[in-house]
Amino acid sequence: MANKPSVDDLKENLSEMQFYVTQKHGTEPPYTGRLLHNKRDGVYRCLVCDTPLFNSQSKYDSGCGWPSFYEPVNENSIRYLTDLSHGMERIEIRCGHCDAHLGHVFPDGPQPTGERYCVNSASLSFTDEKSGDQIKG
């Protein structure tokens, strides 16, 4: 995929958890993510390549323990793959630009889409709309 940093660069610039989640398709423990309770207005971006993924307006509290969104910024920002791991069938979501693992999407979200994009904080950064401050998950 385009613009993906080298493994050495990723290991140098990401925490162990961020590398595990984005590159090894891992999952951070529920209720531990830095961006789970973030309520500020802004944009959630791919931690690896800075591609905009979700607007804060689509974030909601699903009670699942990870940041949840009902729709991505646009149809090209997310890549969808069938995930048959752990004895179940799920839809994995990855960054549409650099292929970093983000989480999964489920058909149990609120309207208007009915979808729940369940995303690891460790795969995201957040840019505050007003201040421009950036928080890494």
UniProtKB/Swiss-Prot annotation:
Binds 1 zinc ion per subunit. The zinc ion is important for the structural integrity of the protein. It catalyses: L-methionyl-[protein] + [thioredoxin]-disulfide + H2O = L-methionyl-(R)-S-oxide-[protein] + [thioredoxin]-dithiol. It comes from Escherichia fergusonii (strain ATCC 35469 / DSM 13698 / CCUG 18766 / IAM 14443 / JCM 21226 / LMG 7866 / NBRC 102419 / NCTC 12128 / CDC 0568-73). This is Peptide methionine sulfoxide reductase MsrB. Zn(2+) binds at residues 46, 49, 95, 98. SUPFAM superfamilies: Mss4-like. Keywords: Metal-binding, Oxidoreductase, Zinc. The active site is at residue 118.
